[in-house]
Amino acid sequence: MKVVIIGGGTAGTATAAKLRRLDENVEIVILEKNNEFAVSNCSFPYYISGVIKDSRQLIGATAESMKEIYNTDIRLNCEVEMIDRQEKTLRITGKPDESYDKLVLATGAEQLRPDIDGVLSEKVMTVRSLRSIRNLKDFIIGNEVRKVLVLGGGYIGVEMAESFVKLGLEVSLIDAATHVLPNFDADMAAPIHNILRGRGIRLYLQRQIAAFDEAQAVLSDGTRLDYDLCLIATGVRPDLRLPVLAELEIGERGGLKVNRHLQTSDKDIYAAGDNLEIENLITGRPVMFSNASLAVKQAKIIAENLSGIGSEFSPVVGTSITPVFDYTAAAAGCSEKMLQDNGIDYFKLNIYQNTHAGYLPESGQMLFKLLFAPDGKILGVQGLGQNGIAGRIDTIAAIIKSGGSVAQLEEAEICYAPAYASAQDAVNNLGSLAQEVLSGKIRFAFYDDIGKDDVFLVDVRMPEVFQSGHIDGAINIPLAAIRNNLDSIPHDKRGILYCNRGVGAYKAACILDNRGFDNVFVLSGGSNLFSEIMEDKSQQ
């Protein structure tokens, strides 16, 4: 059997490697249109910032090593023009046709380049290939660049903006959305915005670039920004030129449609990586999800199917993670917008918790948001903090993958020692609070509830803390004084209790609930999150 793989990125090389480990006799050919392959696009920001010194470190393998270790024929500078499905041949630019028994499309995605006046200027660049990232760095060094625009607030946009700041450049980030990082909700994006602004990045949200001239970019609201360089980071779309020419079926989201075995509408043609649609575990709907980890999993499934092992690619949770200077932002599952778009009912809550025992000097703060269904099924989680975020999000993602509920979060056995976690870890607390929400024991209010006419706002912190600053309209009843001030809290209004992080307010709410108050709420995320959101709004 002869297997030809079009594309030498993560999906293509991983397919070849796994297939060779399973079958020593199969003939494997990789056709790559560029002169380099196995390039780690995800590491481009680290090359720009100088963490990675040599661009050759971005290359994960060479044609020689793939030949020696995996007996794979790597052909660079081979661009496939057309797939002849009837004859099972590939037309290659300037080279003889190539036959195949089985074909794997690992063509990835292509950079979206918006149609903007002046976008073809040499000062307006994209980064999708090794050549392009080298050109970008050379341009910065050779042209005394000081002012940089980043168009696009997704993961690559935010990471590249950070890298430019680390080079000492002035950075403005422009995005048409209301907030950066689309897998996050607005409340969780607010502190991320504040971190970015705190490091000097100017945010221009709900705006686009309308035109470029030689010295300035004109935004959709008329704002003019000086620039020496603009990076286009507006996302990618599947590279479907070959599948469309071959009349393979395209899915409803615009990606290549595949079955659970990752076969296209032609059973002899498989696909892996950024060019295909996959099923979202929570919504049951097709999604486009660019992720190297998923590409490797898909490569394994294809290799096993080509070797006669009947493997299936299961629906995905959808995980993501990115550094934001000294912080880590990570998410798994659905955001509120995704749930709303798919008509899925949900509850939500936010909590702050220490990374580990608070009495240790290295302890930091983490912020989490949990989304869950009325039946307790976990729908999504988002986290932000300086330490400890990845492990918690991964744990919850694994529970989501297994179809788990909030009860399993509370029951999860998390490694404990004071230097690593609290005795009641954030994962457990999220599950515990979610179960109390479902039972009606606790009710949460949110930042947009503040200021409504039917709300009575109570700050349960100590008087000296209250005097140093509080939410407008709040009265102060310290937690220890709640029982002696029951008459001060009306029954005919929604009582919203808050403290810094929500712990004291939760304790006060339990007291009031046990005293017959059935209209008491805890401000989700406390005044800390409320302040982050208000600060963000004040800067917009």
Where are these regions (language model features)?
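N-terminal Rossmann-like dinucleotide/flavin-binding domain of flavoprotein oxidoreductases
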Residues: K18-K102, D185-R202, K337-M338, N429-S432, ...
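Glycine-rich dinucleotide-binding loop and its adjacent helix/turn
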Residues: T107-L167, R202, V258-R260, I475-A481, ...
